[in-house]
């Protein structure tokens, strides 16, 4: 007896969206269901090699499609892994890997763009409801006895019950809406398969009725004959020699592989022979995948052994900083029954990974030769590329060459260009870390370097706080934070004479008394336009904020205060009353902290003194 179940809230939202909103490119429903069938065949192909109870299974993978114009139905069937009752509940009734939540959060309101997101978010099955008022799924899991039927009209609930099905696999029948009945046509289905699923690695067969006429005049008779033909080529495109492939072949395969409606930016097709034999086909997308910065991101690379699918969920096939790459690795040397544990320690795969990484970085270097193309690439993938600096020491120098930065003088500069622009007086490549570029550009400390004609890299990506201190140097030139003592020493600031130092001692003492344990020292300076500058050895407010967000204890670094005695404010403060000096110290220190992106510890005191100053000025 069938039992009723409620969809999760997000699934109900998604179904409503599919039925009422995402009607642009409705034809993708077939692409998605064929893709799911292909995945089911991939999984069973692998299990027949690795799972004892399935090794004797007779299995010739295929996808069958049939239709009935009168009944307005389309049926898609595969003989893959199949589903049992629990699988149906998990895959068809609730959210898997937060895919649906992510999908819903990414919707833009543009129907064409939103339709294009369907496959990328793993919610493709529900696209059936774009054209069907009723969907019936009958499935039998390989190695199990019972078969189950899943039925829904897309209205918030579904039913599951036992059914009769002889062989393993899944059959999905769509009962089409009146306005979508035209999809139940041989030519419609063939056209969609050629457009979206030509390069699916398994044969797709279409059953149809062909009419023939015999006789003449009144004796003319229509003879209907049931026929079946294979629609796709079912070839592993990556195994076809490059000379035999056209750009359109690569682009069509990319669409099948990635479910991305945009064309790829570049592709790299490599066949390696010798001690190791393998083929790789990698794509660099135009747009970043939605989960690029998620911990549970989906790997974009599929691993095959001798054309047998092994996994699409191994994040070690490429370094994490190349997780935007889509593609295929097909090895001739790995054992077919390779396990996930073996994969992680396998020398063959490690060699393939190393060579593939170099190939991809080389192609990115080629993109960088065209500034317009590289700006497009870097806007999408620049942040994630920086991660390679702390994880891929072998390719660190190549990655450094690929990075681009905003600086005080330029909006888009490489380290090579920065170095070439350095004057003879400049000893280091200088950078400054902060939460946003506007704050960095207004930082008082930056003025000191600008006055000397030194350019400064302005770094506001969170990843910068982690990787830049680790870089050390570029082409034998050290990289230094402008907050460091070494960088400040390179400014060559004129020393303060003894008479001036003595004249300002009361003011220095007043600042020390007012700020107490919040500072390490007060010094005099004569460079820059700002009245006060904070100096912290290895100051990194971004890193401090990151550590605080992660619940880690932030090591306290007390700043050195530099008072700019060329600023008219200090000429007046030098003879001011003690209460005025205290008030000025608190306000100037607080303002400097805000400018550098640090947190005010004594915000209440700052606010009190600010209000007091405003009252005095009125």
UniProtKB/Swiss-Prot annotation:
Molecular chaperone. Has ATPase activity. Keywords: ATP-binding, Chaperone, Cytoplasm, Nucleotide-binding, Stress response. PANTHER family: HEAT SHOCK PROTEIN 90 FAMILY MEMBER. Residues 546-618 are annotated as: C. The gene is htpG. Coiled coil: none annotated. Signal peptide: none annotated. It comes from Helicobacter hepaticus (strain ATCC 51449 / 3B1). SUPFAM superfamilies: ATPase domain of HSP90 chaperone/DNA topoisomerase II/histidine kinase, HSP90 C-terminal domain, Ribosomal protein S5 domain 2-like. This is Chaperone protein HtpG. HAMAP family: HSP90. GO terms for cellular component: cytoplasm. Homodimer. It comes from the Bacteria. It holds the Pfam family HSP90. Its main location: cytoplasm. Residues 1-340 are annotated as: A.
């Amino acid at each position: 007896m069938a039992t009723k179940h409620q969809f999760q809230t997000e699934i109900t939202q998604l179904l409503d969206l599919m039925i009422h909103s995402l009607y642009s490119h409705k034809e993708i429903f077939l692409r998605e269901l064929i893709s799911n069938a292909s995945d089911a065949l991939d999984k069973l192909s692998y299990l027949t090699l690795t799972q004892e109870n399935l090794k004797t299974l007779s299995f010739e993978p295929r996808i069958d499609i049939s239709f009935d114009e009168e009944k307005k139905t389309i049926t898609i069937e595969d003989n893959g892994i199949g589903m049992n009752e629990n699988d149906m509940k998990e895959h068809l009734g609730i959210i898997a890997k937060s895919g649906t939540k992510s999908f819903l959060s990414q919707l833009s309101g543009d129907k064409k763009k939103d339709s294009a997101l369907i496959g990328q978010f793993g919610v493709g099955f529900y696209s059936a409801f774009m054209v069907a008022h009723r969907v019936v799924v009958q499935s039998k899991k390989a190695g199990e006895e019972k078969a189950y039927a899943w039925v829904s009209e897309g209205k918030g609930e579904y039913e599951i019950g036992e059914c009769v099905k002889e062989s393993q696999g899944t059959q999905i029948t769509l009962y089409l809406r009146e306005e979508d009945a035209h999809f139940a046509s041989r030519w419609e289905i063939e056209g969609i398969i050629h457009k979206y699923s030509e390069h699916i690695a398994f044969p797709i067969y279409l059953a149809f009725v062909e009419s023939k006429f015999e006789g003449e005049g009144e004796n003319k008779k229509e003879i209907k004959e049931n026929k079946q033909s294979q629609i796709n080529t079912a070839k592993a495109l990556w195994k076809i020699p490059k000379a035999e492939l056209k750009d359109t072949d690569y682009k069509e395969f990319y669409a099948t592989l990635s479910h991305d409606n945009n064309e790829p930016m570049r592709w790299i097709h490599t066949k390696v022979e010798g001690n190791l034999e393998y083929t790789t086909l990698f794509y660099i997308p135009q747009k970043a995948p939605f989960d690029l910065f998620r911990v549970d991101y989906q790997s974009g690379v599929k691993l095959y052994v001798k054309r047998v699918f092994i996994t699409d969920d191994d994040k070690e096939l490429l370094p994490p900083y190349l997780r935007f790459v889509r593609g295929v690795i097909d090895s001739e040397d790995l054992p077919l029954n390779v396990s996930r544990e073996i994969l992680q320690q396998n020398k063959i795969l490690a060699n393939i990974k190393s060579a593939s990484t170099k190939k991809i970085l080389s192609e990115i270097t080629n993109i960088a030769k065209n500034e317009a193309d590289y700006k497009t690439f870097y806007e999408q993938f620049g942040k994630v590329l920086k991660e390679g600096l702390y994880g891929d020491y072998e390719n660190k120098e190549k990655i450094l060459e690929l990075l681009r930065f905003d600086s005080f003088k330029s909006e888009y500069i490489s380290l090579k260009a920065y170095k070439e622009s350095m004057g003879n007086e400049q000893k280091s490549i200088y950078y400054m870390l902060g939460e946003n570029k506007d704050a960095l550009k207004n930082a008082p400390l930056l003025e000191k370097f600008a006055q000397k004609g030194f350019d400064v890299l302005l770094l506001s990506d969170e990843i910068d706080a982690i990787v830049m201190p680790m870089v050390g140097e570029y082409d034998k030139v050290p990289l230094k934070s402008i907050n460091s003592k070494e960088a400040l020493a390179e400014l060559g600031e004129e020393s303060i004479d003894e008479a001036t130092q003595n004249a300002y001692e009361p003011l220095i003492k007043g600042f020390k008394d007012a700020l107490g344990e919040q500072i390490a020292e007060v010094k005099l300076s004569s460079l820059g336009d700002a009245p006060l500058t904070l100096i912290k050895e290895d100051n990194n407010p971004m890193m401090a904020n990151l550590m605080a967000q992660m619940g880690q204890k932030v090591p306290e670094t007390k700043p050195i205060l530099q008072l700019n005695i060329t600023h008219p404010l200090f000429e007046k403060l030098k003879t001011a009353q003690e209460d005025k000096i205290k008030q000025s110290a608190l306000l100037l220190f607080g303002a400097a902290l805000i400018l550098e992106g640090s947190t005010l510890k004594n915000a209440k005191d700052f606010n009190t003194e600010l209000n007091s100053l405003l009252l005095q000025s009125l």
